Amino acid sequence: MAFISVFDVLGPNMIGPSSSHTAGAEIIAYLAQKMITPPLKRADFTLYGSFAKTYHGHGTDRALLGGIMGFSADDTRIRDSFAIATERGLAYSFTPNETETDIHPNTVDIRMENAEGRVMVVRGESLGGGKVRIVRINGVQVDFTGEYNALIVVQRDKPGVVAHISKILSDRGVNIAFMRLFREGKGHTAYTIVESDQRLPEGVAQLLLENPNINDVMIVQP
């Protein structure tokens, strides 16, 4: 018999009327902001499918803005996301895209720019019941849910990099639940995503960056 989570039946604790359009949207944005050094100065949201049609009426816009500011799905400040973003000096925009149809119906692209001028673009899908999937980072197709502690390594696709990552984690006693490599092409930019059911110890990022073929390390913990 298939296991059914309580979230599949009732959905998560959340602010807003829909687990797909509010809680899921908030979680996508919350995960996205973990991938860039704060503070953010701008966030631009492109919405697809049903997100594009109902984003204002269902509170998807407030949920996305709250998530990008680091609010959890049950944080009552989400109701005042617009005012809080203005107070913080965070510029934002929402652009519905109803022409691209070959895409999951609850999809959003989030373009973030921080105070240092660094830009990152993340695509996420809201699957229902507060479950989400991150499917693209800076144009590279990836796949992770944010349900585990995630280590995201941005690297050049060179021999020995994955072995370096595995050794560092093994030496620090990290139990790997999932480990996958995503790349643009041979020798180009690649992402290794490691998911673990334990929190990642301090200092892991610095040790990984000792490899000259590793450009960046992001830790996304729920």
Segments predicted by a language model, with ranges:
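Acidic-glycine-rich active-site phosphate/pyrophosphate-binding loop
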Residues: 1-6, 37-41
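An N-terminal amphipathic alpha-helical segment
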Residues: 30-41, 46, 130-131
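Contiguous domain-boundary segments centered on the initiation and propagation of an alpha-helix
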Residues: 69-120
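A structural-propensity feature for long, helix-poor, extended segments
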Residues: 44, 48-87
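Catalytic-loop motifs flanking and including active-site residues across diverse enzymes
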Residues: 24-28, 60, 161
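Generic secondary-structure signature for well-ordered alpha-helical cores
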Residues: 11, 15, 33-38, 69-73, ...
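Conserved phosphate/anionic-ligand binding catalytic regions in large, soluble enzymes, centered on
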Residues: 11-29
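A conserved regulatory-domain signal marking ACT and ACT-like small-molecule sensing domains
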Residues: 92-96, 122-222
